């Protein structure tokens, strides 16, 4: 969701460039989309490289978690699919690439959105393929049982993990640690 508005702006910038160069609308849209795909791929490659090669003065690497998988816009879907494809490709020299650890990827599964015939079938398939080849991403169910699912069902909010398994306690907009009323999310 965070990358969606930036992806849309980037696409529009590419589209305007190709239209101003005289390309027909359909061709301009096709080439602009390919440019956006390449930008997304390079952006996620850059993330992975930096998060796994730049350590602190103590030698620590940033432990970053990225949750994805629920955005139904074409830009949100593209971002999630490209992120998964980059992870699947790995980092390193050709022929010796390995999947990296950071950022930790978490796929948010919703039985109403994912699977055959559902709005995010392509995103779900990209997640399955990435898992098949790399053991990543981790999967959290928004419609199953457990803390994440219960918070999502009750408040419509997604709780992302910090690092491996730590989740922040809910913070309610008006009540803080405890909800002010049934509508406080």
State where each predicted segment sits.
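Conserved catalytic cores of very large enzyme subunits
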Residues: 1-185
């Amino acid at each position: 969701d965070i990358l969606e508005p930036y992806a849309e702006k980037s696409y529009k910038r590419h589209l305007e460039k190709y239209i101003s160069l005289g390309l027909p609308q359909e061709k301009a849209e096709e080439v602009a989309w390919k440019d956006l795909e390449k930008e997304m791929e390079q952006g996620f490659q850059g993330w992975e490289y930096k998060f796994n090669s730049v350590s602190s003065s103590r030698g620590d690497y940033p432990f970053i978690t990225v949750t994805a998988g629920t955005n139904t816009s074409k830009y949100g879907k593209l971002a999630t699919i490209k992120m998964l494809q980059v992870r699947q490709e790995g980092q390193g020299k050709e022929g010796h690439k390995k999947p990296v650890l950071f950022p930790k990827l978490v796929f948010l599964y919703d039985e109403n959105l994912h699977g055959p015939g559902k709005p995010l079938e392509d995103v779900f398939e990209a997640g399955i393929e990435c898992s098949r080849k790399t053991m990543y991403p981790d999967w959290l169910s928004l419609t199953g049982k457990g803390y994440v699912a219960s918070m999502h069902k009750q408040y419509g909010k997604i709780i992302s993990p910090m690092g491996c398994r730590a989740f922040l306690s809910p913070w309610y907009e008006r009540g803080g640690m405890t909800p002010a009323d049934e509508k406080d999310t």
